Amino acid sequence: MSIRTNYEKWYEGDDYYWGIEPGSFLNELVDLNPPSAGKKVLDIGCGEGKDAVYMAQKGYEVFAFDLTENGIRKTIALAKNRGVKLNAYVDDINTFVTHEQYDIIYSTGTVQYLFDENKIEFFKKLEKITKPNGIVYINVFVEKSFLELPPDWDREEKMWKSGELFTYLADWKFERIDEVIFEDQSGGVPHYHCMDTIICRKQSNF
């Protein structure tokens, strides 16, 4: 099955596959670029919307896209339930187009679906659509010879090399870079991931 088919199936029920608690990393992004009138956020690969809705609750104007119709449907439903508005729509990380500029852009658990031939263009696009002094947060799964592939790993996902992520946006100010190994239960089987994370700030002279 394709990635779209898999995620559509996971998201079709009333329960939220990833839960509704926002990622802890969002508080770090809020601290680095606090909300104020007119500040915009882009969530690339928003899933069922838990992070996008949280940022809307914080007061940002939020734009969020995902590959799945079910994910966007549940994002809109969660926003309505929480009493906030956002702009949620179906799009693809490999081909998305936006005419906005954003104060915060983040993508978690999605960049591994970038095709290799699209990586350079993707990061060029991020440079173009991030406002001066804006923040970008990205994490990627990293290949390690001593770790097995996760049981729910999709054939369309691409492992990154250790440190590869840090070579993109290299002229930006790094607020945080790290690599961690952690245990996960996705797919119902305990396993380990290695993940690289970058938080960087676009300098005002770009």
What residue spans do the PLM features occupy?
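Class I (Rossmann-like) S-adenosyl-L-methionine-dependent methyltransferase catalytic domain
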Residues: 1-35, 42, 48-100, 114-121, ...
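Short catalytic micro-motifs in class I SAM-dependent methyltransferases
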Residues: 109-110
